[in-house]
């Protein structure tokens, strides 16, 4: 059986940022169940324009024989043309974004184009009040909102008023690093 493929849009998982570190945990923790591609963002990314096949690194560094991970480095977080090209090449089953949604303005401007083909998932780290009403259009443009805390679930449900979510669309996925 072929594994589903997820296109992750976040900080490059090889980088040491908090978002990069948690992105790495997502991928390594689920690579036996999913194939992964990533638009890996960084400031002035040294590998921009390359496609980095991580198959050998997965095997050598983590003992993973059947994992698929390809990183498309980007200075910043990509753009519509880059995304369209990667969607054609990788043919993912879903997109998952992770970081402040305001970094993805270009993505949300093309959400209908994307969601007509595949769903958009958002791992949401917003847990501070007051309610970020400016995030309403971002939350409403996602098919699944995975939230780091019960407070974040509360925020999403109070902000996403025009298009209320079903329970399965707004889940609690605890934030943290695998201690194993």
Model-based region annotation:
Residues 8, 52-151:
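Extended catalytic core of nucleotide-activated donor transferases of GT-like folds
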Residues 143-180:
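Donor nucleotide-sugar binding/catalytic pocket of nucleotide-sugar-dependent glycosyltransferases
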């Amino acid at each position: 059986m072929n594994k589903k493929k997820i296109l992750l849009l976040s900080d490059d998982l090889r980088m040491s940022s908090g978002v990069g570190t948690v992105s790495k945990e997502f991928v390594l923790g689920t690579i036996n169940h999913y194939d992964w591609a990533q638009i890996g963002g960084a400031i002035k990314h040294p590998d921009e324009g390359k496609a980095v096949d991580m198959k050998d690194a997965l095997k050598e560094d983590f003992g993973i024989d059947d994992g698929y991970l390809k990183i498309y480095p980007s200075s910043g977080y990509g753009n519509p043309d880059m995304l369209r090209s990667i969607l054609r090449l990788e043919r993912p089953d879903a997109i998952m974004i992770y970081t402040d949604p305001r970094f993805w303005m270009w993505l949300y401007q093309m959400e209908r184009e994307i969601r007509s083909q595949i769903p958009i998932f958002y791992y949401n780290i917003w847990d501070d009040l007051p309610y970020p009403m400016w995030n309403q259009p971002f939350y409403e443009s996602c098919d699944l909102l995975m939230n780091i805390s019960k407070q974040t679930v509360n925020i999403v449900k109070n902000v996403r008023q025009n298009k209320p979510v079903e329970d399965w669309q707004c889940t609690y996925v605890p934030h943290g690093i695998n201690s194993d």
